[in-house]
């Protein structure tokens, strides 16, 4: 059955317009980009097959556009639309950070770090530098490592913060294993960063650990006190 033969309120596009994007499943959202689907399938079934064979959603969408276009049911047009939508989401969140809006909503900052770091095959430690009104000044990836970890140097974080005339920083790093639970080493590095930044009156507002699922906030755990 073609999607046009479905009840109107169950078609992905009409459902999105009537109830909002959050009402759609992953497959329904992906189906909007798929378009007509493969021969003998509707777009939602093609999207389900894509998620089943090449998913889940995060690793599927972390692929570059050139890799997406080779997947059955997508092609160049759909791949470009997906890549453009993801980049727009990234830029939208960064613009909110630059205006200081998203910093009143810690999960949004965590999502930003997740967008930047989650697809990396090795560990990356990044810093978001903020002014005295907690607006974003710059985002920098300062340290990289292997799949097992990255060497973090608090003095370099302090040096870059002073260079940017930052009043506060938020840091984050990814766990390539996919497990976002902070390790003892993560907590130890956080304490060293906190102490080093306090010496120059710069606040460490949070440390996010990025893996599969929701980023873990060390501030939320009470580990930055």
Swiss-Prot record:
Question: CDD domains per the record?
Answer: MPN_DUF2466
**Residue ranges constituting the MPN domain according to the UniProt record:** 102-224
Q: Where are the transmembrane segments?
A: none
Task: Return any one Pfam family short name.
Answer: UPF0758_N
Question: What keywords tag this UniProt record?
Answer: Hydrolase, Metal-binding, Metalloprotease, Protease, Zinc
PROSITE patterns, sorted: MPN (PS50249), UPF0758 (PS01302)
Please list the residues that bind Zn(2+). 173, 175, 186
User: A GO biological process this protein is involved in?
Assistant: proteolysis
UniProt xrefs under InterPro entries: MPN, RadC_JAB, RuvA_2-like, UPF0758, UPF0758_CS, UPF0758_N
**Motif, JAMM motif: chain positions:** 173-186
One annotated GO molecular function is:
metallopeptidase activity
**Family annotation (NCBIfam families):** PRK00024.1, radc
* Protein family membership: Belongs to the UPF0758 family.
Q: What is this protein called?
A: UPF0758 protein XOO0495
